[in-house]
Amino acid sequence: MDLSGAQGELPLPMHAAASPYLGLHHDHHHHHGGGGGGGGMNGRHMSPPTPPAAAEESKAVVVVSSSATAAARYRECLKNHAAAIGGSATDGCGEFMPGGEEGSLDALRCSACGCHRNFHRKELDAAAAPPLHHHHHQLLGVGAHPRGHGHHHHHLLVAALPPPTRMVMPLSAMHTSESDDAAARPGGGAAARKRFRTKFTAEQKARMLGFAEEVGWRLQKLEDAVVQRFCQEVGVKRRVLKVWMHNNKHTLARRHLHPSPAAAAGDDDDDGAPPPHPDPRRRELAAAAAPPPAPVTQHIKKSVDNKSLISSLAALHCIALLLFHQIDA
């Protein structure tokens, strides 16, 4: 029995597994002729083991990647020490100096400024950077085929370069950019945040003033149906009416209860005009504000007390005169 096509799982080489350039490997097999022993079990195509030459090339690729990592240099420190107070201040460190041996935790901290290495600007050496595109015969991953197979096309995903270091922007720059954006967009957020002011007509003001005087400048004691009906008639909302009454309570109410002297003089001069119709609600408010009159019994009691005091003083005067005459005799 021919078992040449049934091959087990191949072991994964350590050097190939550790390589950062190990990507997806797709093999497109073009078979000519009938299905021979080249097809694996269950329709799978098994790849031959990696030859020594390919392993050497993989090791060489790993060395190049390590040298590219070592080529990165960290320049000036960008840590903002005044971010808590909204300012921008750096320590002036010009280049990262490791504080310990390579591989230790102290190696990630700068011995000059004491900041972490990530705060320093990262600079990559363009000459030592690994190329982004390789041919299929330069990088061979797990299960790759040796050179000379014209029927296999290898597509490798090369590991991308490390992401660029995030620049720490000062708060002043960020605020400036935001203000520039706001200035570049007229009618944007500033107009949206502007409070809308309600404008009333003269008729609405007169009707709201009369309603406020009738209810005593308060809406708590009224039924909601009455207030809602009035708001629908005037064309304002309940909240708007309440705010208007609160804003004009100390001005319009006092003006109507205590008119100015000029207005009173004008009313006196206009004798021919008929007197205005008295408002019962206004009369009640005026009566409540006036002090209560003193009772008549209090006046009578005070007059009686004064008369009794005068009579007692006259009696004492007579007694004093009699005593004086007796002493002289």
From Swiss-Prot:
Putative transcription factor. A zinc finger (ZF-HD dimerization-type) spans 74-123. InterPro entries: Homeodomain-like_sf, Homeodomain_ZF_HD, ZF_HD_homeobox_Cys/His_dimer. The keyword Cell membrane does not apply. The keyword Cell cycle does not apply. Residues 193-256 bind DNA. It is found in: Nucleus. The lineage of its organism: Eukaryota, Viridiplantae, Streptophyta, Embryophyta, Tracheophyta. Keywords: DNA-binding, Homeobox, Metal-binding, Nucleus, Transcription, Transcription regulation, Zinc, Zinc-finger. Homo- and heterodimer with other ZFHD proteins. The gene is ZHD3. Pfam families: ZF-HD_dimer. GO terms for biological process: regulation of DNA-templated transcription. Its main location: nucleus. This is Zinc-finger homeodomain protein 3. One of its GO terms (cellular component) is nucleus. The record marks M245 as: Required for DNA-binding. Residues 24-58, 252-298 are annotated as: Disordered.
